[in-house]
């Protein structure tokens, strides 16, 4: 489970600036969920190799009588989802009525709250911050989010309690990858964690109940560490699975479509915890921007994906063809993912989903030798040579595996970091086709040889120093 950090405060205190600074990594999800989360923005961020979800709650107003209860329930829902709350105030404005109202609300919550004074650049920070001790929220932390001043120190302090609470969950990525490269992991013997995600009322509940009903095995609900998600162990064809159900707890017989509460945090955490993500979309509504956001997050997280288009039964043939054309147009960036047309209610096509799930997992965890990867790279070069960069041909020397789940291929060569994006995509697609990889993203990294003398000054030998002194004396005499 990824820990959650919520940014709370009045409008224009710098929450969005800090949000953008924290989510500057390539893995960041910079997408809004309009209509589902109000003003809240959710992003994936990275600090010192640690992954976490950050929420920008949007501006919260207050008055002399405090925050309106109903508005607080809506605007401060992120506080309930958070492990850590960063309460941001504007050091230049001093304490306002809105700050006091928000502080009163936060003191009632059983959450770790850090009071962050933003915009301390160019002013006497100590005197400006002193006023905020009246909010009675403990120590103050001064930052300038626009310039990054104090942000790293703040994160270091924030992550101490999180690391203590989740020592087995939050592991720096470089450590995890080293363990993955050196330990022989038998993925076939591990339970396959399958997250079923999607927008509200696309049929997730019905699909999960259909899967569990078809298996006719004794299952039980095992509450996971992810908020409100349910981890359901099951077995299919002698294969162990764990279904990660983000739709909440329900009785098996209750398969009617109720209005589901959509929790973005719950969904993103389920994606991070899964091996394969089954994304359910509604055929009658076609693909939406929110569906694309979920797919994009799964890809950025390196998860294998399978897409299920639900409620396919009962549609006219011409309508089905129209939907297929729309899916082809909007899902071109994930053409490697298997697409299934199903009816969770009637069971049509549900059994075939697991064939694609197992295929995607096998593709993500297959071991590939250095010789095979290098051979494929050489074949790709023979068909299409790398382009010229500054008049010189880019040289690709060899390739090797850098990790699994998802597959990570590292290519060594000269000037490889200058390869244009089009050629990088060509290599990824060539590797995918040659390896027969389906359902999982492939990550390719490029590395150049390190020059050990780069940035170092040459030391003169004794004879060179004497020669230099003689030359300097000669030049002085000429003047």
UniProtKB/Swiss-Prot annotation:
GO terms for biological process: ribosome biogenesis. The lineage of its organism: Bacteria, Pseudomonadati, Pseudomonadota, Gammaproteobacteria, Alteromonadales. GO terms for molecular function: ATP hydrolysis activity; GTP binding; ribosome binding. InterPro entries: AAA+_ATPase (IPR003593), G_ENGA (IPR031166), GTP-bd (IPR006073), GTPase_Der (IPR016484), KH_dom-like (IPR032859), KH_dom-like_a/b (IPR015946), P-loop_NTPase (IPR027417), Small_GTP-bd (IPR005225). The keyword Cytoplasm does not apply. Associates with the 50S ribosomal subunit. Keywords: GTP-binding, Nucleotide-binding, Repeat, Ribosome biogenesis. GTP 2 binds at residues 198-205, 245-249, 310-313. Residues 366-450 form the KH-like domain. GTP 1 binds at residues 9-16, 56-60, 118-121. GTPase that plays an essential role in the late steps of ribosome biogenesis. It comes from the Bacteria. HAMAP family: GTPase_Der. Gene3D superfamilies: 3.30.300.20, P-loop containing nucleotide triphosphate hydrolases (3.40.50.300). Residues 3-166, 192-365 form the EngA-type G domain. Signal peptide: none annotated. Belongs to the TRAFAC class TrmE-Era-EngA-EngB-Septin-like GTPase superfamily. EngA (Der) GTPase family. It comes from Idiomarina loihiensis (strain ATCC BAA-735 / DSM 15497 / L2-TR). Pfam families: KH_dom-like (PF14714), MMR_HSR1 (PF01926). This is GTPase Der.
